[in-house]
């Protein structure tokens, strides 16, 4: 093989190997940080993989927030109007977190079908609803500017 041709082949091989390695590392990093969004009805139906980090959203069901007296543990229920999911969280909730308002939860679905939250995000103003929550509720004929007016069921 001609030396110049051999040198070109080595350069091309180096570029291919380096590019493949870079793509592999990027894919691995993104896989660790991707949180798929699921509405409460999909979680309650069991359509969500357990022990996988997800993002869930809905309205905090009125009367469902229970705070521990001993520590920062909080339990509450989120709903999309069709199904309810219990959320457990340890930490300080955002100032705008309230019953009957939209919330987005980052966490892990337990074997029991509950969510162990690592982060709770609350709405920003009286007309804001997270896009994922609005999309999940749109097909139900219950989309509201906020969670007010949502039929929470009995």
From Swiss-Prot:
Family membership noted in the UniProt record: Belongs to the CcmE/CycJ family.
GO molecular function, one term: heme binding
GO biological process: cytochrome complex assembly
Periplasmic side: 30-154
HAMAP family reported for this sequence: CcmE
Binding residue positions for heme: 124, 128
Naturally occurring in which organism (per UniProt): Cellvibrio japonicus (strain Ueda107) (Pseudomonas fluorescens subsp. cellulosa)
PANTHER family hit by this protein: CYTOCHROME C-TYPE BIOGENESIS PROTEIN CCME HOMOLOG, MITOCHONDRIAL (PTHR34128:SF2)
SS bonds (residue pairs): none
Gene Ontology annotations for the cellular component aspect, listed alphabetically: plasma membrane
Gene3D superfamilies in the record: Nucleic acid-binding proteins
Topological domain ranges for the Cytoplasmic compartment: 1-8
Membrane-protein topology: Single-pass type II membrane protein
Keywords, in A-Z order: Cell inner membrane, Cell membrane, Cytochrome c-type biogenesis, Heme, Iron, Membrane, Metal-binding, Signal-anchor, Transmembrane, Transmembrane helix
Described purpose of this protein according to its UniProt entry: Heme chaperone required for the biogenesis of c-type cytochromes. Transiently binds heme delivered by CcmC and transfers the heme to apo-cytochromes in a process facilitated by CcmF and CcmH.
UniProt name for this protein: Cytochrome c-type biogenesis protein CcmE
Compartment list: Cell inner membrane
């Amino acid at each position: 093989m001609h030396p110049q041709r051999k040198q070109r082949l080595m350069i091309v091989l180096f570029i291919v190997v380096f590019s493949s390695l870079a793509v592999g590392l990027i894919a691995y990093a993104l896989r660790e940080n991707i949180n798929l969004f699921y509405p409460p009805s999909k979680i309650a139906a069991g359509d969500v993989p357990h022990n996988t980090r997800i993002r869930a959203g809905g309205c905090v069901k009125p009367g469902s927030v229970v705070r521990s007296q001993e520590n920062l543990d909080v339990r509450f229920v989120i709903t999309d109007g069709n199904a309810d999911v219990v959320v457990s969280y340890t930490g300080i909730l955002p100032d705008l977190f309230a019953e009957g308002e939209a919330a987005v939860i980052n966490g892990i679905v337990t074997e029991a079908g509950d969510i162990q939250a690592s982060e709770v995000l609350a709405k920003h103003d009286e007309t804001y609803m997270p896009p994922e929550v609005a999309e999940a509720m749109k097909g139900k004929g219950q989309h509201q500017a906020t969670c007010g007016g949502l039929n929470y069921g009995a």
